[in-house]
Amino acid sequence: MKIVESILNRSEEVVYRELQSIASDNNMKVFAKPRLSDVIQKDNTFLTQREFDFYTRSHCDFVVTDDGFRPVMIIEFDGPLHQSDEKQQERDQIKNELCKRAELGMLRINDRHVTKLYRGMTVLRWIVEVTELEKAFNEAQENGQIPWDEGCEAAASRS
């Protein structure tokens, strides 16, 4: 037995570095390869045997947390195998469903999300930052800092 050269392949390493940069700019943290059961806590929710086995044995590619280490979203890097392998697609569906039940956002990306630019930033950065802006906006509305009709007025004025 020997130690692996790296726990991340080259593509995952590129994603990790981009996520680290995004996280540092947004007061968040990034973790690579945590177990799904460390990110999503099982409650009384019924899981089939297949779902339970998957839940206890699988990992996430990346988890983004807030500064208090609470998971904000899972980022899955999908290489070509995810498009062509039926078994992999089944596993992806189970993970998607478990995240949905836990109300934890999941973003499935490929290499274009870290190589293509949109408005001067990677598509991955744009998606994460827009997601965080939406959360901050909704929080501000809930706290009474932004009127509830603010979002509606802006949309109506553009029509």
Give residue spans per PLM region:
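A structural signal for short, well-ordered beta-strand segments and their strand-loop junctions
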Residues: 29-32, 108
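Nuclease catalytic cores
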Residues: 1-16, 20
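Basic, glycine-rich
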Residues: 4, 97, 101-159
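Basic, amphipathic alpha-helical patches used to engage nucleic acids or provide basic targeting signals
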Residues: 60-63, 68-121
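Short secondary-structure junctions
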Residues: 22-30
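Active-site metal-binding core of divalent-cation-utilizing nuclease and nuclease-like domains
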Residues: 7, 31-70
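Alpha-helical scaffold elements within enzyme catalytic domains, especially in hydrolases
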Residues: 21-22, 98
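A short, structure-level motif marking secondary-structure boundaries and short turns
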Residues: 1-4, 79-82, 130
